[in-house]
A protein has these predicted regions:
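Membrane-interface junctions of multi-pass transporters
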Residues: 254-300
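Short, solvent-exposed beta-strand edge segments and adjacent coil->beta transition regions
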Residues: 6-8, 148, 286
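Radical SAM enzyme [4Fe-4S]-AdoMet core and its adjacent flexible, acidic
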Residues: 12, 30-35, 70, 79-82, ...
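Short cysteine clusters
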Residues: 17, 21-24, 233, 251, ...
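Processing junctions and N-termini across compartments
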Residues: 11, 15-18, 227, 280-283
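Short, hydrophobic secondary-structure boundary micro-motifs
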Residues: 56, 148-149, 177, 281-282, ...
Length: 327
């Protein structure tokens, strides 16, 4: 039996990455790996529209580095669930851009700053000019897929944020997002945090889209998730992380993959959710997490109002984008 609510799913094609970002807990990933084709097929079979409203190809690695990238993208085209992808943009050449067009709804590129020194620090090991050229190409070539930007919420990125936003808008990119929390990965990262209240002010000030609502299908389903789960952690309960190994993880903050709930080869999503609903907090992950207890009753009410407002704003932006492309 399917659960009474739908979730978002993060699928990790690879836990290997071509970047060396300071906010990435890569030292915790003991066995970086590539997802095998049979595992990918098993995952696709588990993704049912009545249980999943959105799938994001993301994780701790860079999806465009997978040697089966083109084959894996092809498998998305006829699937009934919505797929999006997150990338750092470094390998996003014209061939990949054209192949992604229409296979995913939204491509989200992580971009830290127009300032070369800041970019070099935050997105270490990547070529800023190459990424910027790839963004221009994607904005020009995409006909069916939308291009969005995830702006990095680190203190180093804020001084040049207005200039970064101006450059992105000058390229015609209108979907600019930011998370109101730089997740500290279960307490493992403490050196790059900004207060959530400050980040929300920045998001509002620059008219950005808050990423805290990207994994929420509806306010009613969040309430049903809250009621069904023993551990009242909204960020955990709205999302499911499927690692490159095919393991369902307790939480996306489990970078070390120490808390698997089951494997896609033997366990469906509905059964996995029933298991997770009965699980308590994991002290090793939860005690130091800056997302824990984030959404208590008062915060949920505020978030619900903001969620409704964000949906109206998103609908308005989408109409403008559609009109712009049609004219």
């Amino acid at each position: 039996m399917s659960p009474s609510y739908r979730i978002a799913v993060n699928v990790e094609w690879t836990s290997k990455c071509n970047a060396l970002c300071p906010m990435c807990p890569r030292d915790q990933i003991a066995n970086p790996q590539l997802m095998r084709p049979e595992t990918w097929q098993q995952i696709l079979a588990r993704l049912l529209p009545e249980e999943v409203f959105r799938v994001v190809i993301a994780g701790y690695g860079e999806a465009t580095t997978h040697p089966r990238f083109f084959d894996y993208v092809d498998a998305l085209r006829q699937h009934p669930v919505r797929f999006d992808m997150v990338s750092n943009g470094h390998l996003l050449d014209e061939e990949k851009i054209r192949h992604l067009d229409g296979a995913i709804d939204l491509l989200i590129v992580s971009f830290s700053s127009i300032d070369p020194d800041v970019y070099r620090y935050v997105h270490a090991n990547l070529d800023q000019q190459r990424v910027m050229a790839n963004l221009q190409a994607a904005q020009k070539l995409f006909k069916h897929t939308q291009l969005g930007i995830s702006l990095t919420p680190m203190p180093e990125c804020l001084p040049a944020l207005p200039q970064t936003i101006d450059w992105l808008k000058a390229q015609g990119i209108r979907t600019l997002t930011m998370s109101p929390t730089l997740y500290n990965r279960g307490g493992s990262l403490q050196d790059h945090e900004l207060a959530t209240a400050r980040l929300r002010q920045i998001i509002q000030q620059y008219g950005l889209r808050s990423q805290e609502f990207d994994f929420v299908p509806s306010a009613g389903e969040v309430f049903r998730q809250w009621r069904a789960n023993r551990f009242k952690c909204v960020p955990r309960n709205v999302d499911l992380f499927v690692a490159a190994s095919g393991d369902y993880l307790y939480c996306y903050n489990d970078a070390a993959h120490q808390h698997p709930i089951g494997h896609v080869s033997t366990l469906g999503i509905s059964e996995m959710l029933r298991r997770r609903e009965q699980m308590a907090a994991q002290p090793g992950l939860c005690d130091g997490c800056n997302m824990r207890d984030r959404y208590r009753a008062g915060e949920l009410v505020k978030a619900g109002i903001a969620f409704a407002r964000s949906r109206l704003q998103a609908a308005s932006r989408n109409r403008l984008i559609f009109i712009g492309k049609s004219s």
